[in-house]
């Protein structure tokens, strides 16, 4: 795994990066805080059994905000990742306007059809577009999960319907 995170306004992003890496280490893994995207460094870190924890950063302009969704997408594509997982405040793609249930999985073609007939909040559309970009650029699956749910990752991966929505290119790519 590779962790890309956002840093709340007013918080030192490098200190936050170190804090997240330390939290992972307290869970029994090795983690290393990294700034920026360098595929060779990521491969080296992973091959030495470390989890890279990345804070999006522009070395030339540290005050410039870089969207972690953009960074995560770039890394997933460059690393030829199998999965890209966005932890958000959304539980996934709602099946209807009542927001009572989400699609456990949906193809990119089905997403395009939904976008023609349904209105999605602007910030959710950003997640959805990043997922679509990911699957069209070679990532097999892109997940939208509610990061506020405790144990959301194991629920997503070890239950039949999961905990959110996985966007796939087509049905054949679900279990590649």
What are these regions (language model features)?
Residues 152:
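Anionic-ligand-binding alpha/beta catalytic cores of soluble enzymes and soluble regulatory domains
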């Amino acid at each position: 795994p590779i962790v890309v995170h956002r840093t709340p306004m007013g918080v030192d992003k490098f200190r936050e990066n170190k804090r997240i890496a330390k939290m992972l280490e307290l869970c029994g893994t090795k983690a290393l805080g990294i700034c920026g995207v360098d595929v060779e460094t990521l491969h080296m870190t992973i091959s030495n059994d470390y989890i890279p924890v990345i804070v999006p950063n522009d070395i030339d302009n540290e005050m410039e905000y870089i969207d972690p969704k953009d960074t995560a997408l770039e890394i997933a594509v460059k690393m030829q990742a199998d999965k890209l997982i966005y932890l958000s405040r959304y539980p996934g793609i709602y099946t209807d306007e009542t927001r009572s249930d989400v699609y456990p999985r949906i193809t990119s073609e089905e997403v395009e059809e939904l976008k023609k007939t349904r209105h999605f909040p602007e910030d959710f559309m950003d997640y959805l577009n990043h997922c679509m970009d990911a699957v069209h650029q070679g990532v097999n699956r892109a997940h939208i999960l509610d990061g506020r749910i405790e144990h959301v990752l194991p629920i997503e991966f070890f239950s039949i319907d999961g905990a959110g929505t996985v966007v796939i290119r087509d049905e054949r790519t679900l279990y590649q």
